[in-house]
Amino acid sequence: MFQELHKGSFNSNGRRRSFVKIYLINKKIEGAIPIMYDLYDFPLYRPPSEAYSLIIQITLGCSHNRCTFCSMYKDKKFIIKPIEDIKADIDAFRALYKNRPVEKIFLADGDALVVPTDILVQVLDYIKEVFPECKRVSIYGTAIAIHQKSVEDLKKLYEKGLTLVYLGVESGDDEALKFIKKGIKAEKVVELSKKIMSAGIDLSITLIAGLLGKYQDNKMHAINTAKIITDISPKYASILNLRLYEGTELYDLMQQGKYDYMEGIEVLKEMKLILSSMDVSKITRPIIFRANHASNYLNLKGNLPEDIPRLIKEIDYAIENEAINVNNYRFL
């Protein structure tokens, strides 16, 4: 999805919105469709795998918003949008797409799963009514949001059409989680992840290589991150590389000389340690593995555990030949 910002306005609730020209490129549609509308509150983020999905914002910002590495929603006050506004947005998107099929919908912003279950049910029901052709509805969630939902709540959401939750795990190491102010311990993350999957909902987790920098105990971060991946055994697991942005606590620590940022080859070595430390006997289901985000120094993809030897060989080759992606941008 390519976004071109034109100008700003205020909606009836006084919230800042942006007019955006978006070229929606769908494999099911020939060509690109230029559309002008003001349905999004920016910044707007989505997982890479949702590139061809319709994005519907049901929250703004992130309810946690304290992670020391994250710059995504620092300028946004967290709110849950009124159901009337959400339904109006869904109607507007239907009018824009007209008879073109919408098979995938992603619910944003950063912690949309925290929306009360009864409201989410209304959203999912309305999506089914307005976009009956939709085959997948996915959502960002936090551990806190999952904790607040009962298994019965999650099963109800699954029955209503919620098929995938994206969860930022970041690390399997308690010291690392404390360092980034994630607000949870690894054991609880595993428990909550299994809770999601027990309801029938697929889980996609993200981890971060280079999180602790050069001189922190990054070895335990890597080893315990390998452990949490195998302990959870989600359908999808992705490893991103840490990129620091102005306005985050980690960036400030780096500027003060209190944090030594890890880059390039050192990050690849940590990714190799994560993969080589996995106890494959604990993997209870095939895991679709990706490290192909714009932040990654090396694009990797495969299935765990079967492709671990090949993935390690690809990392070794990149290290030996210094064949890394030095792109410093993070497009989501």
Which role does the model predict for each range below?
Residues 21-50, 227-332:
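Auxiliary Fe-S-binding modules of radical SAM enzymes
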Residues 62, 70, 107, 167, ...:
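Conserved, mostly hydrophobic/aromatic
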Residues 153, 215-229:
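Catalytic cores of alpha/beta
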Residues 95-202:
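Conserved SAM/AdoMet-binding glycine-rich loop
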